[in-house]
């Protein structure tokens, strides 16, 4: 199908929800926008998915997330890993919780148990969780440092790292073979929970993660010397780090931790930042002001 055929298919097929169709009706007179949304499938590359949020085959939405997850599920099933399950985490971006749920429910419908964090968590904790739980794979819904209109989907393997060759290309091949949305499996959350295929994870993993972090300290005696007086300024950039970073610093005894108040809470719009990238010195303007 060409891009107009795809556009009409999404408008007319009963598989797609009314909200999606209404979004597409609003661009009926914008040929360039229709083409951009439908001229290709959102590429599933070595890093997973990443794209602008919206309706269309070339956008991040519940349907492209389901399609990618079905491909990953097919690969897991061929590897005999269904019994191990998949751990899923997500960040503070628009629709991250919804995309995480869609991935979990697709996995569950394929007979693969999904362990889903009860709220946003940083990516390293996802890596820790999937190893701790003995999962075969992990998914993080995040677009890292991209602008607010983006979201993404990263795949991790049982070693806790992002998938590498040859697995990455094998998973890509499975995703590309999912060409019919009607073949993508899903189920309700209530049914998945009742079947034991959807399980929330949270505090128990947090505790274990914090304890493991403490084991990585190279010079604990130095922390004891300076913890009472050292002043630390921290900013989570509206993302996932606020709770875990403050928690580990408190548990280590640091008494003077100052979090940038304007950037403390999760905010999918990244309101105080032009570009939410810690490699950009300008992103630390508020933190440096607080420090001074």
Model-derived regions, located:
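Gly/Ser/Thr-enriched, mixed-charge loops and adjacent short helices
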Residues: 33-38, 42, 151-283
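Conformational gate/switch positions in structured elements
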Residues: 46-48, 146, 236
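N-terminal small/polar loop signature for handling phosphorylated ligands or for N-terminal nucleophile
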Residues: 87-150, 253-292
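An N-terminal, well-structured beta->alpha segment
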Residues: 7-103, 192-229, 240
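Polybasic, low-complexity association/targeting segments
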Residues: 1-7
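Solvent-exposed alpha-helices and their adjacent loops that cap or buttress functional pockets
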Residues: 36, 79-82, 130-133, 146-148, ...
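Short, well-ordered alpha-helical packing segments
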Residues: 73, 104, 108, 127-131, ...
């Amino acid at each position: 199908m060409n891009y107009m055929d795809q556009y009409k298919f999404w408008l007319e097929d009963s598989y797609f929800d009314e909200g999606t169709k209404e979004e597409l009706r609003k661009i009926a007179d914008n040929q360039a926008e229709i083409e951009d949304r439908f001229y290709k499938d959102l590429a599933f590359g070595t890093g997973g998915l990443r794209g602008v949020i919206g309706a269309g085959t070339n956008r991040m939405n519940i349907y492209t997330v389901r399609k990618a997850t079905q491909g990953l599920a097919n690969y897991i099933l061929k590897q005999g890993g269904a019994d191990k399950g998949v751990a899923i985490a997500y960040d503070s971006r628009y629709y991250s919780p919804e995309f995480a749920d869609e991935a979990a429910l697709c996995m569950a419908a394929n007979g693969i148990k999904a362990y889903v964090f009860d709220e946003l968590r940083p990516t390293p904790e996802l890596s820790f969780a999937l190893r701790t739980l003995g999962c075969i794979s992990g998914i993080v819904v995040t677009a890292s440092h991209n602008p607010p209109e983006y979201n993404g989907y990263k795949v991790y393997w049982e070693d806790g790292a992002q998938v590498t060759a040859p697995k990455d290309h094998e998973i890509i091949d499975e995703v590309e073979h999912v060409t019919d949305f009607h073949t993508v499996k899903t189920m309700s959350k209530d049914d998945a929970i009742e079947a034991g295929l959807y399980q929330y994870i949270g505090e128990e993993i947090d505790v274990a993660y914090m304890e493991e972090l403490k084991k990585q300290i190279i010079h604990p005696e130095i922390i004891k010397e300076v913890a009472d007086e050292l002043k630390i300024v921290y900013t989570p950039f509206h993302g996932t780090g606020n709770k875990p970073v403050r928690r580990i610093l408190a548990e280590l005894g640091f008494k003077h931790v100052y979090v940038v108040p304007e950037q403390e809470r999760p905010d999918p719009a990244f309101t105080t930042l032009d570009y939410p990238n810690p490699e950009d010195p300008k992103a630390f303007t508020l933190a440096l002001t607080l420090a001074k």
